[in-house]
């Protein structure tokens, strides 16, 4: 422990020197000297002394053998060369020091002789990793101890992990008498206090004292021996009964107000679940007011049981002008209300190696265009903020006033913040925001007057007996008082109010107590018209009375991507408007992702809102880099940020459409920058996100540049997949091949030149000889010069290989058929809205195979009656075709097109196979989603005017419905897309029907539950499900394509956990919300 003691003593000198009045600026410490032992491990104390497993191995102390003494460190159970013992050196070896790392190693008896060496895994704060070899690999046997020794130094990096690796993946070995010796100290240049990298505060707990740390509640804090990170001691927190219980320490005396610092600590737990999230948080006190403290999480991470992990982030210390009088860091588990806290939430945990260092100050880019001004829109562009953005000296404030002209309080104008106790309103923070906005000529959006969340319990209880609910009259009066007191105070100062927030239930209809809201249940139907949405009507009327000129908004999430939820919103607003309710706008929160919902669906939702006669506001916009709740944290890559940038551009192009129509009021980003996003730690604990226009250092991301100057960005390469199937050009009568109806269309409409209007839509198929295209162009005027160009070549051409034939892979298809060199490769068919090009492009068989990628782009030229030209492309927004093959999109050649022809027939739904089923087509669930093996099904299909019939025989030897979750039970799921729009999110015609082996049903999307039929029967090999799925708008005299998929869920172990999922078509696992991967069924005419 000598090395750690040395570092601790130096840190103690440093901390004392930074206390006020102690002449910190003149301090110079005596550093460690050459020859000093920084770290020494003999393992005689019986602990691993901070060494942990790298990979699925066992690392423990053994008394079987030792180089000196009686014990050594043993590593067993290895399966990979890199598996072994590891030790963090982050706080042991510093930049530019030269150290000698050594240790004695020997094999456990019976292991094959491998070569062993020490390696350092070195990471920077962006996650980039280097692997530094410390010593030459030495052959080691089980006969004698071998010394591994080498010198090590580094210049860049934020974390160091030393590990022992072997050329043999299975060898078990011993380590003893490990040490790190300082060979050469780093150059002495501490500079002024606050220089980047300088330690300002450290807590190692090796002296056995808690120091100034204290509990936040009734929990117990103690320094324990035998458990530590790279040491023998750490700070343990136990007897916790609340999630916020944890160790806390005051750090403000050690920090310069207004500076940027890096906070880090290591955490570990060894009781309870396999994983647990630990948060690093701050408690802020202003003007010595201990009654109104502010809390903020600065970092969060998911720990694995028994393994230490670092929690770290940069923070900005509040400036002197804020009145900051206390800044305390603490550790906790994710917050829950007391009534929801479980034993898992209150596990004991350990903290060690706490450190705060100075870092480069965070500053905004002052020489880039002002975002709101550059957009030049008539709608307000805003951001949601916390209180730090109201401090003019904080860089977040600078970012806000430079780029935005509207502000929203993220949390401090919600109900619990404004009136925590009945009759006692808290005005301080809201007043600051309103005054700040006035001083900077900004609009204010008030968020929110009424919500089911973050509302104090007293609203809903009897004032004389809190055990009883409030009466209708009491709750109505409280609502009126709350709304009118706040709106009256800020009359003429707050431009817009979110009057009610999130009143639509995800399960359909208005929220009630079962879905988290008591407003509807208590107030109910006041006017006796049979409708219980009266509390919403009253809230709007109260707000209008208090400020007749404020814009009043009904705000909700998910309505841009859920047709059923938007249906509920439209019905509600129609009904309220008919009663004269003063609703001015519908607020679309727009918490979207890079993957959905698609622009087409958002446009449709906006159109439906505008059709009601109200305006549109985008109120909480952000764009997650994750596809859903099941995705774990991933590194942020340049390609990912470029993809996000182009999606942001598409969204703002859509906003411009509605701004030009005069119905877009405002667009608000839910946060200023990624360092303050609410999506960190939500919906997945410990997961960081990057959803906004500015990064964690407040620097402009590609998404910002996509809005102000897209030409500065590289061209993003869109991707699409072509299925394999043979297809013919239209016959002599112009009839197209029916197989095109099974193919999903790729729309493109990026205007390079001219006016918006012309659009394209392409379908792709491939076979062993050619790439087949169906390109539909919307262009109402047929003029000479109208044409479609296709640019296609093998993907490896982008690496500089010789171009294919034709030159540069360019094909020109004239609308009039023309006489060009490509005339024999295509046909053109006119239709009501424009024309369709059918083309078969011969390519080398070497380039046409599943998994191959083609470089592809499309360009439409539209000649217009006024002599001008409009040009639209799919991918190359710089219009540098055909020369720039690297600017083309990617077309991946996929597997067989999943489609089937379904014959007409009406079987009896009883779980038995009628004779009719003998003529039915059969499909199989052979596409893996999860699990390497498990239950699968063969299914037959029939249809009539009312139903699609499915007879599925599932092979599943162990049947289970142990889980309370329907999707984890042994079952099949039937997905249907009646209009075959193949969208990234469900439309009103899309539905999910689930039937388990015991004929218990559950549903998703927009099912017609009352018409659905099913029957099940157990078999020797599993079970049979026969089902009838309701159809709409089908005719027996014509064939019709619909979207369909079949899924089999299997709890293979019978333990209540789904172990495998197999599908007919869609491997994505998103079929419950996304119809784009469904297969296609052709309902053959009778």
From Swiss-Prot:
Keywords: Carbohydrate metabolism, Glycosidase, Hydrolase, Polysaccharide degradation, Repeat, Signal, Xylan degradation
Gene Ontology molecular function, alphabetical: carbohydrate binding; endo-1,4-beta-xylanase activity
Thermal dependence: Optimum temperature is 45 degrees Celsius. Is only stable at 55 degrees Celsius or lower temperatures. Retains more than 77% activity after 2 hours incubation at 55 degrees Celsius and pH 7.
Entry's EC annotation: 3.2.1.8
Cross-referenced InterPro entries: Carb-bd_dom_fam9 (IPR010502), CenC_carb-bd (IPR003305), Galactose-bd-like_sf (IPR008979), GH10 (IPR044846), GH10_AS (IPR031158), GH10_dom (IPR001000), Glycoside_hydrolase_SF (IPR017853)
EC top class named in words: hydrolase
Catalytic residues as annotated in Swiss-Prot or TrEMBL: 502, 556, 620
Record's function text: Endoxylanase with high hydrolytic activity on birchwood and oat spelt xylan. Xylotetraose, xylotriose, xylobiose and xylose are the main products from birchwood xylan hydrolysis. Shows increasing activity on xylo-oligosaccharides of increasing length. Displays very low hydrolytic activity on Avicel, carboxymethylcellulose (CMC) and p-nitrophenyl-beta-xylopyranoside. Also shows transxylosidase activity, allowing the formation of xylo-oligosaccharides of higher degree of polymerization than the starting substrate.
Protein known as: Endo-1,4-beta-xylanase C
Gene behind the chain: xynC
